[in-house]
Design a protein with these regions (language model features):
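Acidic, turn/loop-rich segments in luminal/extracellular domains of secretory-pathway
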Residues: 49-120, 197-217
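Extracellular ectodomain surface segments
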Residues: 1-60, 124-206
Length: 217
């Protein structure tokens, strides 16, 4: 078996690899080696039809992608974006598959270990909205519901802060689940960016920007 680094799609050959340490062998020099079964580690075997290659072989879904292998030992592994997006930049994860090798008489098994290298995936910032009574103050504390002095109570789509709102349509997100989202700049529409200090909040060292009808901190 072999270990390969893979981002996106990766192809290889478990029988005729160029690495001597990973090459499958048979003491019977005249025997022809073929892959007859494949499974994800811990799963059930699926048969691999004779005469197949990685283009028309048997596909098995792993944790982070799908491996397709032929009887000739050739295989292709395609990472699934949704599954692999949670692997952060600089981190890695493995998908392990077990294949059965046959010479027509005897069989043995070995592993294919695919190492998926994480990358910094694009995060998504959603537009946010606030509603306020004239002459009042709207406060959206970190992780809390918005509230406004006066008779208006902002709930639903206007609840929560800009990172962690209760409305999924307004919630900012990052596929790299181990990353921490922070606000780094703020500006009024059409204005210039002002830096937001790390560790600040709206009521402690936050950045104030004056808009057309009021000031946002």
């Amino acid at each position: 078996g072999s270990t390969y680094n893979a981002t996106g799609e990766h192809s290889g050959d478990v029988i005729n690899t160029t690495s001597g340490n990973h090459q499958d062998r048979d003491e019977d020099a005249s025997a022809t080696l073929t892959v007859t079964q494949i499974k994800k580690n811990g799963g059930s075997n699926s048969s691999v039809s004779s005469g197949t290659t990685n283009s028309n072989g048997t596909s098995v879904t792993g944790t982070y992608g799908t491996l397709t292998i032929g009887a000739d030992g050739s295989y292709t592994y395609a990472a699934t974006a949704d599954a692999a997006d949670g692997i952060a930049d600089g981190e890695s994860a493995t998908d392990v598959f077990v294949y059965t090798l046959s010479d027509g008489t005897d069989t043995t098994t070995a592993n294919i270990t695919i190492t998926i290298l994480g990358q910094n995936d694009a995060l998504t910032a959603q537009n946010d909205e606030g509603v306020i009574m004239e002459g009042s103050t709207l406060t959206v504390a970190n992780g809390s519901n918005a509230n406004v002095s006066g008779s208006y109570d902002a709930t639903g789509e206007h609840s929560g802060d800009v990172l962690d709102t209760t409305s999924s349509s307004h919630k900012d997100s990052d596929p790299d689940t181990s990353d921490t989202l922070t606000i780094t700049h703020i500006k009024k529409d059409g204005g210039s960016n002002s830096a937001v200090s790390s560790g600040s909040s709206y009521n402690s060292s936050g950045t104030a920007v004056t808009g057309a009808y009021g000031t946002l901190t």
